[in-house]
Every structure is written in C-alpha cells, then in structure tokens.
Design a protein with these regions (language model features):
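Active-site gating/metal-coordination segments in enzymes
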Residues: 58-141, 199
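Catalytic pocket-lining loop regions of alpha/beta-barrel enzymes
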Residues: 108-109, 122-218
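Mobile, glycine- and charge-enriched loop segments
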Residues: 1-22, 67-86, 188-191
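A cross-family glycoside hydrolase active-site/sugar-binding cleft signature
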Residues: 7, 47, 84-86, 111-113, ...
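Conserved, mostly hydrophobic/aromatic
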Residues: 7, 36, 70, 102, ...
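Mid-to-C-terminal alpha-helical segments outside catalytic/metal-binding sites
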Residues: 1-10, 15-43, 214-216, 229-260
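Divalent metal-dependent hydrolysis catalytic cores, especially in the metallo-beta-lactamase
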Residues: 8-9, 30-56, 81-86, 108-112
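Acidic-and-aromatic substrate-binding clefts and catalytic sites of carbohydrate-active enzymes
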Residues: 21-27, 52-62, 87-95, 117-124, ...
C-alpha cells in the first residue's frame, strides 16, 4: 500500500537532524532517503528545523535559512519531497514576502509551524492573521504544531480563514485528541496528522475514524524524532477497513499536497 508521510523534518546534515540519539546515525539526504525507504514510504513533506536555537537578534534570517534548506532538499530529493516553509508573526512583511517567493517556486505548504522553537505562541494574534490572509490568496495549506494550552487560539485561527486548509500535528493523549475531534467535526477545512504522540495508543485511529471519518486523518511520523516503520505498522494494525487505511496513508495527503 502506498504511504505518504505528511509530517517529517528532513535534513541536509547533523545541524538539522532532530533525533534523541544522533550518534547512532550519519545524517545526510542520502541516508534520509534510505531510512524512509525501509518503511516503504514513497513521499515525504515537512519543514526544516534547526538544532541551533532561534534568537530575536538573528530574527527572520534564521527563518529564511531554514526555508532555503528546504528548497535545497527539494533540489536534491526531487519528487520524493514536498517542502514546507516557516513564517513568523514578529515579521509580517518578511513572512508575506516569503509566501510570495515560495508560491512563485510552486511551494504551497506552510509548516509545520513550531512556535515554541521560534519565540512566539499565539495562533490567533493579529500579526499571524495578516500573514494567513496573504496565504489564503495563494491557496496554501498550513501545518501547525498542537499547542496544548492554545485550544481557543487554534480554533480562532481556523475559523478566521475558511479558505485555508489547516492540519494540526499530533493527536496527543486522549484529553487533547478529543478536543481535536470536536474541531474536525465542526470545520471542513481542518485535518489532523497522526504524527508524534498518540497512535501508539491502540484504537486511537479507529476511534477517530468512527467519530469523524478517515477523510480527516492524515498519516505522519515526525521523522527523524520517531521511528517511521513503527508508525506505518500502527495504522496497518488498526481495526479499520482497507479503504480507511488508504485514505489515511496516502489519499488525504495526495489531495492536500496535490500530488499523484
């Protein structure tokens, strides 16, 4: 069965290799491709993150560096990779210019946005709203990290931009997963990727399918933080239909990423 990993953080070198045990690997784009291939994943998407901490002094130059590395990985990996890029509410004009630049290059995926790594937090702030207004004009998709203490802010962001598709990352534990399910029922433009914490709880995916349907759930791993093969097997083991598995593992991602 085809598998698309909607949520990865690819890397050029050890500087971008977000893994708890980096001494066990020799990170490079070639190693990434081989590693992902072992899990029989045929396509990946996601933003580049840097192990070097963000500072206000470095500002948007830090953000642009991550985005440029995503473009370089796209050059190396070709059709195997859909790059995601970062924006930042402290830099509205620069972020809008980055949206325009990426759109001109055919890049339509914002994120995964990871506010806690980049010195901001409020998904409903007016500055991010202005940036997302611009993204709406280009038909982009926004992937964002679930901020567990930002439940109302996440909802306001989704409500304010009905023409954007939003994908929250990580089901988390049951308390927060149930909150996501309520949003999935309510908003046609909202999806959940199953990366990170969550799907090792057996039955979580089947419960989500029962409550909202498999069309709103998207496969992701959070590689290289998480073991990609384990996540593939977690979906295949769930008591859901083959059609549901296909929707989750690749069809929903194909629709959002506009890949075939």
């Amino acid at each position: 069965m085809k598998v698309i990993d909607f949520h990865t953080h690819p890397y050029l070198s050890g500087e971008e290799f977000l893994n708890f045990y980096p001494e066990c690997f020799e990170p490079s784009p070639t190693q990434l491709r081989e590693d992902i291939g072992k899990a029989e994943i045929c396509h990946i998407a996601g933003s580049v993150l840097n192990k070097r901490s963000y500072t206000a002094e470095e500002g948007f130059a830090y953000i642009r560096e991550c985005n440029d590395k995503a473009l370089e990985l796209k050059r190396i990996l070709g059709g195997f990779y859909t790059p995601g890029f970062h924006v930042h509410p402290h830099f509205v004009n620069e972020s809008i210019a980055e949206i325009e630049r990426m759109n001109s290059l055919g890049v339509k995926l914002i994120g995964e946005l990871v506010p806690y790594m980049h010195g901001w937090s409020d998904y409903s702030c007016k500055e991010l709203c202005t940036i997302l207004d611009a993204a709406e004009q280009y038909g982009m998709t926004v992937s964002f990290h679930t901020m567990k203490d930002e439940q109302e802010e996440m909802t306001r962001m989704i409500e304010a931009h009905p023409k954007l598709d939003f994908v929250a990352a990580h089901p988390n534990e049951k308390e927060y997963f149930l909150l996501h399910l309520e949003r999935l029922k309510k908003y046609d433009n909202f999806y959940l990727d199953l990366s990170g914490t969550g799907i090792f709880r057996y039955g979580l995916t089947a419960y989500g399918v029962k409550k909202v349907g498999s069309e709103k759930l998207i496969f992701g791993t959070d590689y290289p933080i998480c073991n990609p093969r384990m996540y593939v097997q977690a979906i295949l083991q769930e008591p859901i239909t083959d059609t549901d598995k296909e929707n989750i593992l690749f069809r929903n991602a194909e629709r959002l990423l506009k890949t075939t």
